[in-house]
Every structure is written in structure tokens, then in C-alpha cells.
């Protein structure tokens, strides 16, 4: 029996193992079948989200304000001619949340501002320049810092506000230690704090209302339990926003009904002390406070810092015909698109969806989706159309312009075959590739194939923060800032929206999307084909947004085609026509959409910036003798210097600029540089240079400005300048403002570059002092080896070149040259080291007096920077003191 069991047992174990394996195989098969079924079956759709409805109840819900509203008073305009349009913002710290929110709104509105830490005793910043006010408005992040100023500072600030008609905005943020009820120090105003409120309403009688549409109710509880309300019997205070206590809140002290509307934002009309104010009983986290804040800024500045009511919006739908099966539009989706467009046209004049197509992907969806493609083409004349790339390829991947143009021609041929209009003059590159950073081939192909006049991108100057996005013009094409709206190719279902559907609704109802339209006169929104299929979130979002804007604002919404829209943009912001090129390698997103055939290693590590006639050409020559240093190739059109940052060459882009430099054999040890002596006194070069070359070292050479002026005059005579030939040097430098323009132009080129401290301050605005080297021009002339030693140390160049052995003074030339074998030398050209008569005494005395204050300011600046004072400057200051 035991032997039989030994025989049977292995067989039974084998069958059990087989059974387990069969069960596992069956389970895996079932799971695979289920996964296939789920992935291939149409998703059970929940009901489509309905756009947010019309405005909430606009009538009063309960009693109105505790006292009758004061009749509206016109704002007291600031003394326009006596104040700068700059806002002074007192913040608690550089990182405080409310302070950052205040600054973000000012920046988005393009208002100039200056931030200061809320002052302690006696720390009030300077408010005036002689009789001119520096600020048009004062904002306190913490109202108590204003109220509790020491007597001297408070008197100083209040007197300034009264004299210059400057208003104050203040925020009271309650915390757990705040008194529940207290009188605001020095004011007939009581505060009741740490309250829970509900049912917000705008007071239609508030004088400051501009963008805000009054008499609207925001029902429901307000977020948080730290709200403050204001009470006063003084006629100077007018409620702006009002709310009710939540049912569970204890009653507010005084004769106030529980159902009464309690002011959370009040406007001080200035009847108490002559200063108009707007006081907030909370921060800016609640959206309605942002809206009122913008109106308060406009009112208190007499509309000097004020946003216009006109808003232009354009909704682009990218990737038409592109998209995987299951995400594309069907016939019903196209019908809904047409229906919503018609509804929006009743609210937004001329509203038209703008469709961007890639023809290669036409009819690549399911049968239903292909029918949707046909439906779009059937109604093609109801929409605006613009080209993407034929195959949705990123343009920066095409290094050959003709190949790029061929791709565009395929898309254009598709458009012509299907009757798609091609005359809009607008295009968008997939992923904004090639628009910024500039891919020259894209701009050229766009113009040759499509006649493009306008494009848009979210990448200039950077994607984030969005409020910094700007426009520019390049190669005749206007580039507009493009905005996101929270909808991307993967956001296609309402209940699967990242962070939950409430996040989308919050963006629409006073959040990021609402603020984008509120604070930008022109908004081009990027959406995608998939946002209009499935749950049609694109339709939901923009219909809801438009209705919400019309409920709460007086904005006049409208749509323009891209070319008139771009023209309008640059009418509003003409200062943005010129771009500001930046280093593509400093932004990962930029580097990802920049040609891999390009390298930032071709950008220079240092610049010799001038000024002219100080010895910069000699430094260029001496540095070129160093094996680790390579100069830019000479320019055939601008006297060998590139002159990129201060001439029309700048608009040719950084590709043009980098073509003047070789690819270094070793980017870490090789030093590329350029010398353009006209850079020093240019108003635009420091900003442009710092944007593209933020880590570059800057070298300038300073000589006696009187000698520099005389040298320039003689230089112009040698080049046959008729003004220099017909006027003496003294006549040039002493010319009055009534003299001929050509004479005054030569005078400026002689004198203005010598305002050394003024120009250096401009450079130091954009570059840290550690990146700036000031070379003594007199030392360079008499002992160039010492100057070159300082330059090598400043740049960190290795190996170290001994210029004492390298340079030799040439008696015939009268200056230093490269020493060669056999006692020979290699020198600069014949135009360098030119000899001319000494300056006459009258001119020398005139210039000594003329440059005295400039030289004194230069001495002070060098002292602050810890840089040595050049020998010529010491001599000039000594002579001035003796005189």
C-alpha cells in the first residue's frame, strides 16, 4: 500500500500543478481580454458639462448698507505734472505672499513700481526730487505698518500725500492674536476681525468702480475665517464690497443686524484728513479683491495708471486633423462648435474660432472622426484658418530652408484642393518651434510660401511667469504673446481635469484665465482639436469665461483677425517692436526647440566696449597675440567691428551674430571676444548685452575725456569730415544749441562719450561690478604690459602671456607693437598712432571746466566700487582743486 502511495502521489502533485498553471493562464487571458475590451470600446460618456450660466442674482439679498450711501464724488486727480507714474509698495518682506500678489498685478498691468521693506523708525525712503514727487500712489501690504509709523515718518508721508494728491491703499490681515474689535489708530474707523462671512456684493455707489460691474452677488461662504469688516459713522468712508456674517458667527458689537451687509473694503474719500485711501479687510487671495484693487489703483491715480475697457481675444484651435483615434472631433462636435461660435458672437462682436491645420493627417481617425473632418471642411468658410506644418514637424529640425518650404507647400496645396482660405497672414509653428529662439529658415519660408505677417508664441521671453510674455517684430513678421488657458491635448474630460473640475472652474471664475483677460488688452489663447471633441472643454471654458466676464466687469470684448490684431498690439506697445535676444542655453525649453547644429559656445566671453579713441584697438591687437584668445571675424560693413548690439544688425538675430565667431576647440579654455568701441555710451547696449551675455566680462578704457574729445575731432578731420575741416576744435566744443545740426552732432560725439560716470552707471544697472574692468588709458599708453597683466587676471586666462617680452616700443610709429625676431615689429595700421598738433589752451581750459563735475562723479563711483583711480583722473582733480 505504501509503495502504491509513493507511485500515485507524484502523479497527483503533477495534476495539481497543471491545474494551478491552467488557472493562472485563464486569469491572465481574462485580464488581457478585459483590457482589450476596455481600450477598444467607446468610453461611457458622462453628461457634457454645461457652461456656467448667466449672472447670479444682482439684487440685494437682505438689507443694504447700514447707512445711506454717499453720492459719488469725482476722484481727486494727483498733481500729474508733479509726480512720476510710479507706485511705491511697502512690503513685509521680499517673499511675503501678499506682497508678491500686489507686485504681480502691477507687473501684469505694466505699471511701474518700486518696492521697499515697510520702514521702521526714521527709514522712510526719499519721496521727492526737489519739487517733483517720485510716486503717484502708495501701497501698504500691512496697514498697521502705516498706522503705527513714528510721528516724524507719518507726518512726512501724509504731508507728501496731501501736497501731491497721492492716495494710499492698505491691507489689514487678521491673525489669531488680532483684537476682535478695535479702533484704527488715528481714524474714526472701527475694525472687527477674524470673522466668517458669506454672500459678497459690490456697492453700486462706490466711486472707484471702473472695470467692476456693480450690483452683483457672489453667493456662498467666503474662504477662511480671518475676514475683517469696517464700521464708521464718518461720511468719509464709503463701502465698496459688503458681505453678511455666516449663521454661526457671533454678532458684531454695535447696532448691526445679523443680516446686514458689512463692509470688507472701504473707500476713504479724504474728508477726514485730505488723503484718499482704499482699505481692504483681507488680502488678494479672493478673486474679487483683485478686481477691486485694479479699480482702486485707477481711481487713486486719477486714471493715470488705468486699464482700458477694450479687450481683444482670439481663440486658436491647433492641430486640426491631428490626433490619435478616440480624441478627435465628430460631426456632433463640429455642430456644437458652430452653435457655440454663433452664441459667442452675440456677446463678443466678430468672434470666430481660428483653426490651425496639418493636412497630412486628414482622414486618419475613426470613421466617425473622418466624418467630423469632412464636416469641418463643409463649414470651412464659417471659421478662420491658419497653417501648422504639413506633417506637424517642428521647424527647428529643418536646417535646409528649401526642405522646410516644401513642407509648407504641401500644406498649402492641401488647403487649395479643399477650399480652405489661405489669406489670413497668420501661422503658428508646432510647439512654437523656431519662433523664439529664432530659426531664420522658418521666417524666410513663411514669407515666401504663405506671405505670413503674424505669428504667436508663449516662449518670448520665457514661458513662466506668463505675465512677462511680450511681443516683438522680426524679419517683417509680428510676433504676439500667446496665452495658455489650462487646456492641453490630454485635458479632454471634465471630471478628469488635473486637480479636479473645480480647478478649471476656479480658473474661469476669477482665477488665472479670468485675470489673463482682465489684465491684458490682447489675448491669443492656445487650444487643441481634442479640447473640442470628447467633453468639449474648449466650448465650456470660453463660453463660461465670456459670461463670467460680462457678469462682473464692464469689459468690451471683441475679436479681430490676426493682422489687425497685431497692428493694434504694437499701437498699444510700440516699445516692444524691438526684440531682446537672450541666450537659448539658459532656458531648457528654449534649448529644446533650438537647432542642434547651433551652439552657445560661439558666443563671446568678454566684450571690449570702448569708448572710441581711448586705446581699445590696441587692446584688441595685444589680446589677439594670446594663443587662448580669439577675436570675432572682421565685419566688412562697419569698420571691422561687428557693432551688433547698437545698430540695425541687432535685428538680424543671434544666428547672424554668432557667424562672426569660430567654434572654439575647447569651450572652457578658449576665450572668444569682440571689440566695438561704440558700445560704451549707447543707451541700449548694456541691457541688450546683459540679456544675451549675462556672464560676459566687460572691459572699458578711460582716458582724460578732454584728450579723447580732441582725438575724435582730429580723427574726423583725417577722414575728411567737412564739419571738422571747417570749424576749429574750440568752435565745435563750445557750439550753442542754435548752431547747425551737423555741428552739434560732431560736438556730441566729442563730448558725450566723456560722461564716464553716467555711462558706467548704466552698465552697472545690468552687470555686477565684478564683471566690469576699467583700464587706465594713460597706463595703457605708457606701460601696456602692466595693463595686459591686469586684463589677463581679470579674465582668468591661461596660460599667462608675458607682454613685457611680447611688446616693443616702435620709435618711428610712436607706440607699442609686437616684437619680432631681428628687432623687427608688427604694428597697427597707419591710421593708428597718428600725430597731430597739441590742443590749444583755450580748449583745454574749457574742457577742464566742462568735465569737472563728470570727473568728480567718476572718482566717487570708483571709490564705491573699490577700483583704483586712474592717474589722469588724479591729475585732473588736483588741477581742478588748485583752480
Curated annotation (Swiss-Prot):
Residues 598-883 are annotated as: Heparan sulfate N-sulfotransferase 2. Its main location: Golgi. Residues 40-883 are lumenal. Residues 49-81 are annotated as: Disordered. GO terms for biological process: heparan sulfate proteoglycan biosynthetic process; heparin proteoglycan biosynthetic process; mast cell mediated immunity; regulation of angiotensin levels in blood. It catalyses: alpha-D-glucosaminyl-[heparan sulfate](n) + 3'-phosphoadenylyl sulfate = N-sulfo-alpha-D-glucosaminyl-[heparan sulfate](n) + adenosine 3',5'-bisphosphate + 2 H(+). It is a single-pass type II membrane protein. One of its GO terms (cellular component) is Golgi apparatus. Its EC number is 2.8.2.8, 3.-.-.-, 2.8.2.-. Keywords: Disulfide bond, Glycoprotein, Golgi apparatus, Hydrolase, Membrane, Multifunctional enzyme, Signal-anchor, Transferase, Transmembrane, Transmembrane helix. Disulfide bonds join 817-827. 3'-phosphoadenylyl sulfate binds at residues 613-617, 711, 832-836. The chain crosses the membrane at residues 19-39. Residues 1-18 are cytoplasmic. It comes from the Eukaryota. GO terms for molecular function: deacetylase activity; heparan sulfate N-deacetylase activity; heparan sulfate N-sulfotransferase activity; N-acetylglucosamine deacetylase activity. Glycans are attached at residues 233, 350, 400, 666, 726, 802. It holds the Pfam family HSNSD-CE. Belongs to the sulfotransferase 1 family. NDST subfamily. Essential bifunctional enzyme that catalyzes both the N-deacetylation and the N-sulfation of glucosamine (GlcNAc) of the glycosaminoglycan in heparan sulfate. Modifies the GlcNAc-GlcA disaccharide repeating sugar backbone to make N-sulfated heparosan, a prerequisite substrate for later modifications in heparin biosynthesis. Plays a role in determining the extent and pattern of sulfation of heparan sulfate. Required for the exosomal release of SDCBP, CD63 and syndecan. The presence of 4 different heparan sulfate N-deacetylase/N-sulfotransferase enzymes in mammals, as well as differences in their enzyme activity suggest that some initiate heparan sulfate modification/sulfation reactions, whereas other later on fill in or extend already modified heparan sulfate sequences. This is Bifunctional heparan sulfate N-deacetylase/N-sulfotransferase 2. It comes from Homo sapiens. The lineage of its organism: Eukaryota, Metazoa, Chordata, Craniata, Vertebrata.
Amino acid at each position: 500500500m505504501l509503495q502504491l502511495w509513493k507511485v500515485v502521489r507524484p502523479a497527483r502533485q503533477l495534476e495539481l500543478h497543471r491545474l494551478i498553471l491552467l488557472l493562472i493562464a485563464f486569469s491572465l487571458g481574462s485580464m488581457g481580454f478585459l483590457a482589450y475590451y476596455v481600450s477598444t470600446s467607446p468610453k461611457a460618456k458622462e453628461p457634457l458639462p454645461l457652461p456656467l450660466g448667466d449672472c447670479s442674482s444682482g439684487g440685494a439679498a437682505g438689507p443694504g448698507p447700514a447707512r445711506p450711501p454717499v453720492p459719488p464724488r469725482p476722484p481727486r486727480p494727483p498733481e500729474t505734472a508733479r509726480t512720476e507714474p510710479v507706485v511705491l509698495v511697502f512690503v513685509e518682506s521680499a517673499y511675503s505672499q501678499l506682497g508678491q500678489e500686489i507686485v504681480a498685478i502691477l507687473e501684469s498691468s505694466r505699471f511701474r513700481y518700486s518696492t521697499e521693506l515697510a520702514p521702521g523708525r526714521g527709514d522712510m525712503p526719499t519721496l521727492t526730487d526737489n519739487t517733483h514727487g517720485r510716486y503717484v500712489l502708495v501701497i501698504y501690504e500691512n496697514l498697521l505698518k502705516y498706522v503705527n509709523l513714528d510721528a516724524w515718518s507719518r507726518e512726512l508721508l501724509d504731508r507728501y500725500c496731501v501736497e501731491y494728491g497721492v492716495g494710499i491703499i492698505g491691507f489689514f490681515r487678521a491673525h489669531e492674536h488680532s483684537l476682535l474689535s478695535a479702533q484704527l489708530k488715528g481714524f474714526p474707523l472701527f475694525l472687527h476681525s477674524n470673522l466668517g462671512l458669506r454672500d459678497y456684493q459690490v456697492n453700486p455707489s462706490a466711486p472707484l468702480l471702473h472695470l467692476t460691474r456693480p450690483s452683483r452677488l457672489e453667493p456662498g461662504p467666503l474662504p477662511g475665517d480671518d475676514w475683517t469688516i469696517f464700521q464708521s459713522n464718518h461720511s468719509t468712508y464709503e463701502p465698496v464690497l459688503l458681505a453678511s456674517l455666516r449663521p454661526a458667527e457671533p454678532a458684531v458689537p454695535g447696532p448691526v443686524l445679523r443680516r446686514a451687509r458689512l463692509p470688507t473694503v472701504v473707500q476713504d474719500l479724504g474728508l477726514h484728513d485730505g488723503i484718499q485711501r482704499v482699505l481692504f479687510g483681507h488680502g488678494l487671495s479672493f478673486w474679487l479683491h483683485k478686481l477691486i484693487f485694479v479699480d482702486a489703483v485707477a481711481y487713486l491715480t486719477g486714471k493715470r495708471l488705468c486699464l482700458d475697457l477694450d479687450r481683444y481675444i482670439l481663440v486658436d484651435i491647433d492641430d486640426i486633423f491631428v490626433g490619435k483615434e478616440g480624441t478627435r472631433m465628430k460631426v456632433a462636435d463640429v455642430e456644437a462648435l458652430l452653435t457655440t461660435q454663433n452664441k459667442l458672437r452675440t456677446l463678443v462682436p466678430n468672434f470666430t474660432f481660428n483653426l490651425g491645420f496639418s493636412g497630412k493627417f486628414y482622414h486618419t481617425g475613426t470613421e466617425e472622426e473622418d466624418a467630423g473632418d469632412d464636416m469641418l471642411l463643409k463649414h470651412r468658410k464659417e471659421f478662420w484658418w491658419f497653417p501648422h506644418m504639413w506633417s506637424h514637424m517642428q521647424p527647428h529640425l529643418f536646417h535646409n530652408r528649401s526642405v522646410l518650404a516644401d513642407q509648407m507647400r504641401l500644406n498649402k496645396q492641401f488647403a487649395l484642393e479643399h477650399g480652405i482660405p489661405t489669406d489670413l497672414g497668420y501661422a503658428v509653428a508646432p510647439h512654437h518651434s523656431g519662433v523664439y529662439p529664432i530659426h531664420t529658415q522658418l521666417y524666410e519660408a513663411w514669407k515666401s510660401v504663405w506671405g505670413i505677417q503674424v505669428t504667436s508664441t508663449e516662449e518670448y521671453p520665457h514661458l513662466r511667469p506668463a505675465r512677462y510674455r511680450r511681443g516683438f517684430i522680426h524679419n517683417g513678421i509680428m510676433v504676439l504673446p500667446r496665452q495658455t488657458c489650462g487646456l492641453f491635448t490630454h485635458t479632454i474630460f471634465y471630471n478628469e481635469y488635473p486637480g479636479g473640475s473645480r480647478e478649471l472652474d476656479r480658473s474661469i471664475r476669477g482665477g488665472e484665465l479670468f485675470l489673463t483677460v482682465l489684465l491684458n488688452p490682447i489675448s491669443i489663447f492656445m487650444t487643441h482639436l481634442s479640447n473640442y471633441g470628447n467633453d468639449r472643454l474648449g466650448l465650456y471654458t470660453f463660453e463660461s469665461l465670456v459670461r463670467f466676464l460680462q457678469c462682473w466687469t464692464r469689459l468690451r470684448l471683441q475679436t479681430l483677425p490676426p493682422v489687425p490684431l497685431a497692428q493694434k498690439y504694437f499701437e498699444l506697445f510700440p516699445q516692444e517692436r524691438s526684440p531682446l535676444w537672450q541666450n537659448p542655453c539658459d532656458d531648457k525649453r528654449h534649448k529644446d526647440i533650438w537647432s542642434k547644429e547651433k551652439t552657445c559656445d560661439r558666443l563671446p566671453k568678454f566684450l571690449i566696449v570702448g569708448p572710441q579713441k581711448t586705446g581699445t584697438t590696441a587692446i584688441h591687437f595685444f589680446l589677439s597675440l594670446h594663443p587662448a584668445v580669439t577675436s570675432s571675424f572682421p565685419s566688412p560693413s562697419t569698420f571691422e567691428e561687428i557693432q551688433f548690439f547698437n545698430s540695425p544688425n541687432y535685428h538680424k538675430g543671434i544666428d547672424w551674430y554668432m557667424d562672426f565667431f569660430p567654434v572654439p576647440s575647447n569651450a572652457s579654455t578658449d576665450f572668444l571676444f569682440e571689440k566695438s568701441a561704440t558700445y560704451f555710451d549707447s543707451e541700449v547696449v548694456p541691457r541688450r548685452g546683459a540679456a544675451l551675455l549675462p556672464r560676459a566680462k566687460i572691459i572699458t578704457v578711460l582716458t582724460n575725456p578732454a584728450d579723447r574729445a580732441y582725438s575724435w575731432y582730429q580723427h574726423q578731420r583725417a577722414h575728411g569730415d567737412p564739419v571738422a575741416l571747417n570749424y576749429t576744435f574750440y568752435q565745435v566744443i563750445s557750439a550753442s544749441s542754435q548752431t547747425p545740426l551737423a555741428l552739434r552732432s560732431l560736438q556730441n560725439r566729442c563730448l558725450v562719450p566723456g560722461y564716464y560716470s553716467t555711462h558706467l552707471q548704466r552698465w552697472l544697472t545690468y552687470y555686477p561690478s565684478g564683471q566690469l574692468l576699467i583700464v587706465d588709458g594713460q597706463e595703457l599708453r605708457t606701460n601696456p604690459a602692466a595693463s595686459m597683466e591686469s586684463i589677463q587676471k581679470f579674465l582668468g586666462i591661461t596660460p599667462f602671456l608675458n607682454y613685457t617680452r611680447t611688446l616693443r616700443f616702435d620709435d618711428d610709429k610712436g607706440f607699442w607693437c609686437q616684437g619680432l625676431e631681428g628687432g623687427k615689429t608688427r604694428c597697427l595700421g597707419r591710421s593708428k598712432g597718428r600725430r597731430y598738433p597739441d590742443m590749444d589752451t583755450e580748449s583745454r581750459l574749457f574742457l577742464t571746466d566742462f568735465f569737472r563735475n563728470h570727473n568728480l562723479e567718476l572718482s566717487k563711483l570708483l571709490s564705491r566700487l573699490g577700483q583704483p583711480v586712474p592717474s589722469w583722473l588724479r591729475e585732473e582733480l588736483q588741477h581742478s582743486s588748485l583752480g
